[in-house]
Amino acid sequence: MKTKKPIVCVIIPAFNEAEAIGRVIKDIPEMVDEIVVVNNNSSDNTQEVAKDAGATVLYEKRRGYGYACLIGMAYFD
């Protein structure tokens, strides 16, 4: 019987994290299948930096960790 490889995904809520988000994404282990950054109404270029680093970027205009996490979880639902 073959066992399926588990799928590992990471959700990162982000608000004005342009200076750090690229490094955070690059430091995530290669075993992770998909990285989703939820841009939480940032006024900097968080979205562009995250996308350039290889993440899927979602947008949530309502500020707050909970809103961003819910959008990220809904993406995988």
Segments predicted by a language model, with ranges:
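Structured catalytic core of nucleotide-sugar glycosyltransferases
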Residues: 1-77
